[in-house]
C-alpha cells in the first residue's frame, strides 16, 4: 500500500479478486468453462454480425441495431473474461488500481449502451408495427445513426462520471474483493470514506438508464401488442410476436440481472449470489443473445446458413 500525500491515510495500489472458486481443482474447470463460453459468445455474435453485413435482406433498421448489440455482447464478455482467464493461468489474483478502474469504466460504458440500444430497438418495433406508413421516414439511416451516437454519448458520460467519482474515495484496506471483476457495489464496501455521493449518482443513473428505458419499452410494447392483435393474418401475428418475443426475452434477462446487482447496496458483504448474477450479466447474457435471436428468426437463420455455405465453398 502507498501513503497518500498530505494525509495519514494509505491508498491501495492493487486489489485482490477472490474469483469464482478458491480450490485449484475447480479453477481448472472454471478456466475450461469460461474459455468455452468466450469462444462460443464471440463466435456466435460475430457470425450474426457477418450475416447481417453480407445479406442485403438484413440491411434494415432492426438488424442494424441487432448488429450493434452483437458488438456490445462481444465487448461485454471481453472486458471481464480474458482478464480472469489470465489470472487463472498465472495463479495471480491481484489487479492493479488503474486496471480495476479501467475495467469498471468499460463495463459500465457497454452496459449503459446496452440499456439505450434495447430501448432504441423497442422504438423501432413500435414504429414498424404501429406506424408502418411512416416507418421509413421516421427510422431512416440518419435517425438510426443518431440514436446510436446519442446512446454512446450518454453511456460514455455515465461511465466516466462513476469512474471519476470513484477516484475520490479512499481505500485504506483490506483490499480483497469477493468477486471476479471490479464493480461499484464491491468497491463501495471497501472504501474507508463516505460513499453517499457515489450511491446517489448510482441511484440517479438507475433512474435515467434503467427505470426510464424500461417504462418506455413497456409502453411501446403495450401499443405493439394492441396493434398485433388487430392483424387478421395468423402468419402476420406469429411473425410479429416472434420478433418482439426475442427482444422482450433479452430485455427481461438484462434488466432482471441488473436490478439484482445494483439494488442491494445496503448489504454488508458480497455473496456467492452476487457472483452468480455477475456470471449471468457478463457471460451467460452475451452467450444467449445470438441463440435467442437466431432460433426465433428465420431471416437470421437463412443468412447464417448462406454464410456457412460460402465458407465451405471457399475452403
From Swiss-Prot:
User: Which GO MF terms does the UniProt record name?
Assistant: G protein-coupled receptor activity; olfactory receptor activity
Which UniProt keywords are listed?
Cell membrane, Disulfide bond, G-protein coupled receptor, Glycoprotein, Membrane, Olfaction, Receptor, Sensory transduction, Transducer, Transmembrane, Transmembrane helix
Q: How does it sit in the membrane?
A: Multi-pass membrane protein
Residue ranges in the Extracellular topological domain are: 1-28, 83-103, 162-199, 263-275
Q: Which GO terms describe its biological process?
A: signal transduction
**Cell compartments where the protein resides:** Cell membrane
Does the entry annotate any disulfide bonds, and if so which pairs? 100-192
What SUPFAM superfamilies would the database entry show?
Family A G protein-coupled receptor-like
- One Pfam family for this entry, by name? 7tm_4
Entry's transmembrane regions: 29-52, 61-82, 104-123, 144-161, 200-222, 240-262, 276-295
Query: What glycosylation sites does the entry record?
Result: 8
Superkingdom is Eukaryota
Which terms in the GO cellular component ontology are assigned? plasma membrane
Stated family: Belongs to the G-protein coupled receptor 1 family.
Q: What does this protein do?
A: Odorant receptor.
PANTHER family, per the entry? OLFACTORY RECEPTOR
What name does this protein carry?
Olfactory receptor 3A3
Amino acid at each position: 500500500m502507498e501513503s497518500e500525500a498530505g494525509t495519514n491515510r494509505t491508498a491501495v495500489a492493487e486489489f485482490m479478486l477472490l474469483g469464482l472458486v478458491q480450490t485449484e481443482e475447480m479453477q481448472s474447470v472454471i478456466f475450461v468453462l469460461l474459455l468455452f463460453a468466450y469462444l462460443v459468445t464471440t463466435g456466435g455474435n460475430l457470425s450474426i454480425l457477418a450475416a447481417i453485413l453480407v445479406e442485403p435482406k438484413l440491411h434494415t433498421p432492426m438488424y442494424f441495431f441487432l448488429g450493434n448489440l452483437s458488438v456490445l455482447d462481444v465487448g461485454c464478455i471481453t472486458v471481464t473474461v480474458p482478464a480472469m482467464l489470465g489470472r487463472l493461468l498465472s495463479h495471480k489474483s491481484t489487479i492493479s488500481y488503474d486496471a480495476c478502474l479501467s475495467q469498471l469504466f468499460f463495463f459500465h460504458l457497454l452496459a449503459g449502451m446496452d440499456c439505450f440500444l434495447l430501448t432504441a430497438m423497442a422504438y423501432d418495433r413500435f414504429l414498424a408495427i404501429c406506424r408502418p406508413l411512416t416507418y421509413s421516414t421516421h427510422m431512416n439511416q440518419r435517425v438510426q445513426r443518431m440514436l446510436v451516437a446519442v446512446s454512446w454519448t450518454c453511456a460514455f458520460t455515465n461511465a466516466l462520471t462513476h469512474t471519476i467519482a470513484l477516484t475520490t474515495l479512499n481505500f485504506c484496506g483490506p483490499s480483497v474483493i469477493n468477486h471476479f471483476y471490479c464493480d461499484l457495489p464491491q468497491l463501495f464496501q471497501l472504501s474507508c470514506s463516505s460513499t453517499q455521493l457515489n450511491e446517489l449518482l448510482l441511484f440517479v443513473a438507475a433512474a435515467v438508464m434503467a427505470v426510464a428505458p424500461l417504462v418506455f419499452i413497456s409502453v411501446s410494447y403495450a401499443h405493439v401488442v394492441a396493434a398485433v392483435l388487430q392483424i387478421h393474418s395468423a402468419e402476420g401475428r406469429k411473425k410479429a410476436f416472434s420478433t418482439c418475443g426475442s427482444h422482450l426475452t433479452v430485455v427481461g434477462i438484462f434488466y432482471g440481472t441488473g436490478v439484482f446487482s445494483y439494488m442491494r447496496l445496503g448489504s454488508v458483504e458480497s455473496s456467492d449470489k452476487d457472483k452468480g448474477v455477475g456470471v449471468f450479466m457478463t457471460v451467460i447474457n452475451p452467450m444467449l443473445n445470438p441463440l435467442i435471436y437466431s432460433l426465433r428468426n428465420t431471416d437470421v437463420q437463412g443468412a447464417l446458413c448462406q454464410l456457412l455455405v460460402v465458407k465451405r465453398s471457399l475452403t
